[in-house]
Amino acid sequence: MKLVFMGTPDFSVPILDSLIEAGHQVICVYSQPPRPAGRGHKEQLTPVHAFAHERGIPVRTPKSLKPAEAQAEFAALEADVAVVAAYGLILPQAVLDAPRLGCLNVHASLLPRWRGAAPIQRAILAGDAETGITIMQMDAGLDTGAMLSRESILLAPDTTAPWLHDMLAAMGARMIVETLARLEDDEPPAATPQPAEGVTYAHKLAKEEGLLDWRRNAVELDRKVRALNPWPGVWFEMAGERIKVLEAAVTPGSGAPGTVLDDQLTIACGKFALRPLKVQRAGKAPMTASEMLRGHAIPKGTVLG
């Protein structure tokens, strides 16, 4: 098929790669504009832009698709279909209608649960037992289109966002190729409207969500550690220093929230206790909590912020 791909982050790259490997003619890639990043604030291409550039595929990076000129340029591509995966821009109706078969979205949740920007992290934060991928026919709403394909994956008590990200990207890459094959064979999958019940929204992650509130249940805080690394990261304050928690475990224990209960940095929470296992001090490399404690003791009874 002659298709346009629209995507931006690392999640989208395996999906684009699978379309190329399946023999589809990717005539153009749309991605978000380069943005300053790193200490030098040099402009960096998005992961999808960089990948497409390496493959010699033309890339367009409009700031918006609302201008009539941008919509006309898109329509002039005369694509059979557009595949969208974590693109990050709103598609006006004129864009949705331009490809012969419309626009298909690869979304990292079991819709209608977790519509929106951060479905992978929100599923872990909520303690969901499962999540998955939905392939949908896009409409003008926010992830409200009819579902063409849906597959689930179980979430374990130790599932992390990076692991789930990679699993779902691979699942989405396989599923979109299968969906397009059925469309090519004139055996389109049934378009199932999303149910009205069970709608939730995966709001964009905010930096302040990473602060550990010891008044909460340790189970919730462990979910934060697993969901919010590497970004925005999870941390607590100690003597004015921000210490990141990269891995942790829930343990039995009780005390005033934020109190260090032993020499292993077990910290009392609103319910149960949390023991950081891997941490990172400001300007330092990641280390085990025991390594940090050898050089920077945190006595039992210390109350952390």
From Swiss-Prot:
GO terms for molecular function: methionyl-tRNA formyltransferase activity. The keyword Protein biosynthesis applies. Gene3D superfamilies: 3.40.50.12230. Signal peptide: none annotated. It holds the Pfam family Formyl_trans_C. (6S)-5,6,7,8-tetrahydrofolate binds at residues 109-112. GO terms for cellular component: cytosol. It catalyses: L-methionyl-tRNA(fMet) + (6R)-10-formyltetrahydrofolate = N-formyl-L-methionyl-tRNA(fMet) + (6S)-5,6,7,8-tetrahydrofolate + H(+). Its EC number is 2.1.2.9. The keyword Protein biosynthesis applies. Belongs to the Fmt family. NCBIfam families: fmt. Attaches a formyl group to the free amino group of methionyl-tRNA(fMet). The formyl group appears to play a dual role in the initiator identity of N-formylmethionyl-tRNA by promoting its recognition by IF2 and preventing the misappropriation of this tRNA by the elongation apparatus. This is Methionyl-tRNA formyltransferase.
